[in-house]
Design a protein with these regions (language model features):
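Alpha-helical transmembrane bundles and membrane-interface segments of multipass inner-membrane proteins
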Residues: 1-159
Length: 159
């Protein structure tokens, strides 16, 4: 494996580690009450006591076994597609590898919660969205920015 390929792996694994560590640490701090309620913008953006989210995205309720199997299937599918795309092309930036890792790290963070607790710990409120956590930020922001960078780079190659 050449040095260029190794750097891409470092960024990918770094994205996983960054989001996963932040997610696990913040959830532990919130659950233990070390981080209490904190307001950034009153009634709009704040940290709350933790909420047990026993559903999936946007509170959709499914049996726990289906949530775990579904989460694993989605993670494996993302890994398969991601590896084919990111590690099979020459023109993928380090930032894109980090973003891909952030998405996977977020998925792992929520999967760990489901397996260990039977629910996901949520604690960040940003109205009008449902309560969420760091893993959700890694997944959502990671995907949006990743698709944006992919779209921009595809436009650049066409011109």
């Amino acid at each position: 494996m050449n040095i260029g390929r190794k750097i891409h792996w470092v960024f990918f694994l770094g994205g996983i580690a960054d989001i996963l560590i932040l997610d696990v640490v913040t959830k532990v701090l919130v659950v233990r009450g070390i981080i209490g309620e904190f307001t950034f913008i009153k009634g709009f953006f704040y940290i709350t006591t933790f909420r047990k989210n026993d559903g999936i995205a946007f509170g959709i309720d499914l049996p726990m076994w289906l949530q775990i199997v579904g989460s694993l299937a989605i993670l494996l599918l993302l890994l398969k597609i991601g590896f084919e795309y990111f590690f099979g092309r020459q023109q993928v930036s380090l930032f894109e590898h980090w973003l891909f890792g952030a998405v996977i790290g977020g998925g792992l963070g929520n999967l760990i919660d489901r397996v260990l607790h039977g629910y996901v710990v949520d604690f960040i409120v940003l109205r009008p969205f449902p309560v969420f956590n760091i893993a959700d930020i890694g997944i959502t922001v990671g995907l949006v920015v990743l698709f944006g960078t992919m779209w921009l780079s595809s436009r650049e190659t066409k011109t």
